[in-house]
Swiss-Prot record:
InterPro entries: Aminotrans_V_dom, GcvPB, GDC-P_C, GDC_P, PyrdxlP-dep_Trfase, PyrdxlP-dep_Trfase_major, PyrdxlP-dep_Trfase_small. The lineage of its organism: Archaea, Methanobacteriati, Methanobacteriota, Stenosarchaea group, Halobacteria. GO terms for molecular function: glycine binding; glycine dehydrogenase (decarboxylating) activity; pyridoxal phosphate binding. Belongs to the GcvP family. C-terminal subunit subfamily. This is Probable glycine dehydrogenase (decarboxylating) subunit 2. Keywords: Oxidoreductase, Pyridoxal phosphate. It comes from Halobacterium salinarum (strain ATCC 700922 / JCM 11081 / NRC-1).
Length: 473
């Protein structure tokens, strides 16, 4: 192993030194003289490796990693479902490999897919108009905040400077509102884990621009008072924003627009399997009611009276939030997923997600203090440290749940198995949970003991990060 780790960066003395780059006849390269010396270098500093060493390096890395193709991934509020390969096939079609700067005439097929995806998402969410431009879920949130800001500026002078966010909301809700220039008002949850109507009434006022909600919330609980909540927000002159993180629990059974939400974003990497991770690209489409459609980003796709598809600028558009029409390959995957499953398939996926969460919860030895829940639940590790539980679960070959959050549950284990796990997998996952629940303190404190990397000193890693192979000893 030590020899292998060394060989990644430089061959041992006497070994071949095969360059990864081909020889170049150009002996000199012009460098911008304005660049400082510490940003220029004489060599590219790539490791010199033979092809077998390089192949083994990446295979070994893949064996040390864990993803949805490795096993269950019950990371709460993340919807880590299996990503079917047919969506990759769709995105790899030659017809999808088009440059966005081509003429509208040459892009009719592309624009047709985008137009239909806008329609699909609008019908799923109960929204009147949808933009596909935002490149990620958080970017979708920020786009929604910009739309709310533009709406209030146009309708009541823009004096509203507060956005209300529940204490159990995703951190991006707080960040998006703050980035939009709003003061964030944190809304305490009730004892049942849901919105406290009295607390909401106290928080609402003439400066309220919006309330951001996830429904079901991060505890997996459906906001049963969503209709009076919507009425209260609207009576105060605010808008109701839907964070689509947990939309997987509602597909085909309920729609945010029907609940009174004015704006929502879709996390296509969660709900529509586009997939997660890898540093992107992503997509965070935003849906709005008809009253807000004129504020959508520029340009938007529509169908002309003659049947052709065209780009147009909404009359009070907030402008661009991303280049061209967003991350096209990701949108193709979302389109393929929705088109393949159809209305009944999406509803079935949602029902199975809720069923799987409830089945798994019923098998666990850990207490689950709040319910009834939908697609996810939050168990309490009790006297155990939730972070230790997570590390110990790695020893049993499964990915741990989200830990320590929401803080409404002590030592929280937020768990979302998704619809793509079988009963056998759920039983194995329950066995892992329960084995950890019965472990002694020593086993928890030492975990993980069966993984390639042992427990990391998180404090030292934060204070002294090693971000390059130059930093290795």
């Amino acid at each position: 192993m030590e020899h292998y780790e060394q060989a990644r960066y430089a061959p041992a003395e006497g070994e071949t030194n095969e360059p990864l780059l081909s020889e170049n006849d150009q002996t000199t390269v012009s460098v911008d003289p304005s660049l400082p010396d510490d940003l220029t270098r004489d060599t590219v500093e790539l490791p010199s490796l033979e092809e077998p060493e390089l192949a083994r390096h990446y295979v070994r890395l893949s064996q040390q990693n864990y993803g949805v193709d490795s096993g269950p991934y019950p990371l709460g509020s993340c919807t880590m479902k299996y990503n079917p390969r047919f969506t990759e096939d769709a995105a790899a079609l030659p017809a999808a490999a088009v440059h966005p700067d081509r003429s509208e005439t040459a892009l009719q097929g592309t624009l047709a897919v985008m137009h239909d995806l806008q329609d699909y998402l609008g019908r799923i969410g109960g929204m009147d108009a949808v933009t596909l431009q935002p490149p990620a879920g958080a970017a979708g949130e920020f786009t929604g905040i910009l739309i709310a800001e533009a709406y209030h500026e146009a309708t009541d002078g823009g004096h509203r400077n507060e956005v209300i966010v529940p204490d159990a909301a995703h951190g991006t809700n707080f960040a998006s509102a703050a980035l939009g220039g709003y003061d964030v008002i944190e809304l305490p949850s009730g004892d049942d884990g849901r919105v406290d109507l009295d607390a909401l009434e106290a928080a609402l006022g003439e400066n309220t621009a919006a309330l951001m909600l996830t429904n079901p919330n991060t505890l997996g609980l459906f906001e049963r008072d969503i209709e009076p909540i919507a009425e209260m927000v609207h009576d105060a002159g605010g808008l109701l924003y839907y964070d689509g993180a947990n939309l997987n629990a509602l597909l085909g059974r309920a729609r945010p627009g029907d609940m009174g939400f004015d704006i929502m974003h879709f996390n296509v990497h969660k709900t529509f399997a586009t997939p997660h991770g890898g540093g992107g690209p992503g997509a965070g489409p935003v849906g709005v009611t008809d009253e807000l459609a004129g504020f959508l980003p520029d340009p938007h796709v529509r169908q002309s009276a003659g049947g052709d598809y065209e780009l147009y600028t909404p009359p009070r558009s907030i402008g661009k939030v991303h280049g061209f029409q967003g991350n096209w390959p990701v949108l193709v995957k979302a389109f393929a997923y929705i088109d393949r499953l159809g209305d009944s398939g999406l509803a079935d996926a949602s029902a199975k997600a809720v069923l799987n969460a409830n089945y798994l919860a019923d098998q666990l030895d850990y207490e689950i203090p709040l319910g009834p829940f939908h697609h996810e639940f939050v168990a309490s590790a009790g006297d155990q440290d939730a972070a230790d539980v997570a590390k110990r679960m790695l020893d049993y070959g499964v990915h741990p749940p989200t830990t320590k959050w929401p803080e409404l549950v002590a030592e929280a284990l937020m768990t979302e198995p998704t619809e793509t796990e079988s009963k056998r997998t759920l039983d194995d996952l329950a066995d892992a949970f329960n084995a950890v629940a019965g472990d002694d303190d020593a086993a928890l404190a030492d975990a993980p003991s069966r993984t390639t990397a042992r427990r990391i000193d998180q404090t030292a890693a934060a204070r002294n990060p090693r971000l390059s192979w130059h930093d290795l000893d």
